[in-house]
């Protein structure tokens, strides 16, 4: 889980204000942070299969949110993936 301070920072950066944590861009940023943190965890704990299930669920949720954002607002999609460096 991400702490509240980091969520506020991501909300300001991607959503415009610290209370805009429900914006799609902010949700994607939070999930990306969690995914990056779990990648580091799995480098040291290769046999942690139970956490891997949650990791895959987070990846799938982010994938769905990115697809939705791409359909709804393509410009915002492009800026989000460039800021997060998650696609080419």
Curated annotation (Swiss-Prot):
State the protein's purpose: One of the primary rRNA binding proteins, it binds directly to 16S rRNA where it helps nucleate assembly of the platform of the 30S subunit by binding and bridging several RNA helices of the 16S rRNA.
Recorded name of the encoding gene: rpsO
Q: Which GO terms describe its cellular component?
A: cytosolic small ribosomal subunit
Alphabetic keyword roster: Ribonucleoprotein, Ribosomal protein, RNA-binding, rRNA-binding
A GO BP entry is: translation
Q: What is this protein called?
A: Small ribosomal subunit protein uS15
**Xref: HAMAP family:** Ribosomal_uS15_B
**Family matches, as Pfam families:** Ribosomal_S15
The UniProt GO MF terms for this protein read:
rRNA binding; structural constituent of ribosome
Family of this protein: Belongs to the universal ribosomal protein uS15 family.
Share what the entry says about its subunit structure, partners included.
Part of the 30S ribosomal subunit. Forms a bridge to the 50S subunit in the 70S ribosome, contacting the 23S rRNA.
């Amino acid at each position: 889980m991400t702490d509240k301070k980091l969520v506020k920072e991501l909300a300001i950066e991607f959503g415009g204000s610290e209370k805009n944590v429900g914006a799609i861009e902010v949700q994607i940023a939070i999930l990306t942070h969690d995914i990056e943190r779990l990648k580091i965890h799995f480098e040291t704990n290769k046999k942690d299969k139970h956490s891997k299930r949650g990791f895959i669920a987070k990846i799938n949720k982010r994938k769905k949110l990115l697809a939705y954002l791409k359909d709804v607002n393509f410009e915002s999609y492009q800026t989000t993936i460039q800021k997060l460096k998650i696609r080419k």
